[in-house]
Amino acid sequence: MMKSKEIIDRNLSEGREYIPEFEAYAICEEFGIPHPGYQFVKTMEEGTRAAEALGYPVVVKIVSPDVIHKSDVGGVIVGIESKEAFTAAYEELMRNVKEKAGEVTIDGVLVQKAMPKGVEVATGGLRNDQFGPVVMFGSGGILIEVFKDVAFRLAPLDKEEAKRQIEDTKASEILKGVRGAAPSDMDGVAELIVNTGRLVSELSEIDEIDFNPVMAYPTGCCVVDARIIVKKRV
């Protein structure tokens, strides 16, 4: 947990409440939260080496303290399958952000291994003034906003309670397998919820966590987009 504390303290000391995604993944590592392979780079040359090391296909995401919702400014490009495509995507990424976000600080680019499609779910957490740390689970992607398919629990929680939380959502039916699809790894998703609960309860500076989407597979699951917001506690 020392590395997570160092990341949070450094960002707060620099006046940043939004943890860069590559550092959010480093925090995830300490709490047993699965995520794709990734590298943070500052130049196109570093990026092409990172993509080769990770293996195509890859995704690129802008890393900027001024850009929270990356997709809104064209700050995410997926499905990059070659060195030539990477070069074009890197240039497009920079062009998009400059055109749509204006003069913003760009720290670099996150190069991330593209993950196979799975059942999209979401988990997260927040620190409530009345109840303390709370963990959320629900349908992933835009469905969480459209259908409000979410369930909440106080954190920390054990795996059995996490499974009951899953059952409280419509997402549980999809995870069990529909129209001949293989069932997803319910134990793996429950473990992710437990570890997300540990994260929000053990690190008091955490204000909000948003892991969306999470890809659930027949074996295991993977957080493919991570947002962590922190605040100084008096």
Language-model segments: residues:
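ATP-dependent carboxylate/acyl-activation modules
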Residues: M1-V234
